[in-house]
Curated annotation (Swiss-Prot):
Belongs to the Smg family. It holds the Pfam family DUF494. This is Protein Smg homolog. InterPro entries: Smg (IPR007456).
């Protein structure tokens, strides 16, 4: 599923450039992705759109609060992912409403705890879905696969 999300980011400048879901599914299948992964990715993207709509009110709230994670969130996300989300927020890359969307989409992931590389992809897709300006250094960090670097 995450390979498909990166593929979409690399091949479509904005979410509006993506074709309708049925056409996109056919294109992804033609690109060699498995149907189960395509269904998972499209479902995840649908959830992203729903969550974004729900967070519109949150965007109006002042961002002076402090985020406390529940035990369930901590178990699903893990300390490395929570630390990275906090880093993005403190660096001004991820405002509070987008942070909540990242957390929601990470909790929708079947992986537990969600690896740091997956959190980076989730954050990238949330920023992409909002057509946010992404600094080149931030983009490089979000697309960096630490797991691949650790292999000798």
């Amino acid at each position: 599923m995450f390979d498909i999300l990166v593929y979409l980011f690399e091949n479509y400048y904005t979410p509006q450039a993506c074709p309708a879901a049925d056409v996109l599914a056919k294109r992804l299948a033609a690109a060699g992705f498995e149907h189960e992964d395509i269904d998972d990715a499209l479902g995840w993207l649908y959830g992203l759109a729903e969550t974004t709509e729900r967070c519109v009110e949150l965007a109006q709230a002042p961002a002076s609060g402090f985020r406390v994670y529940t035990d369930a969130e901590y178990q699903q996300l893990g300390s490395a992912s929570i630390g990275f989300i906090t880093f993005l927020e403190s660096a001004g890359v991820l405002p509070a409403p987008l942070r909540e969307i990242v957390i929601d989409r990470a909790l929708a992931s079947p992986e537990a705890p969600v690896s740091l590389s997956k959190i980076k992809i989730i954050a990238l897709m949330v920023l992409w879905s909002q057509e946010a300006e992404i600094d080149n250094l931030v983009l490089e960090e979000l697309l960096d696969d630490e797991e691949a670097r650790r292999l000798h």
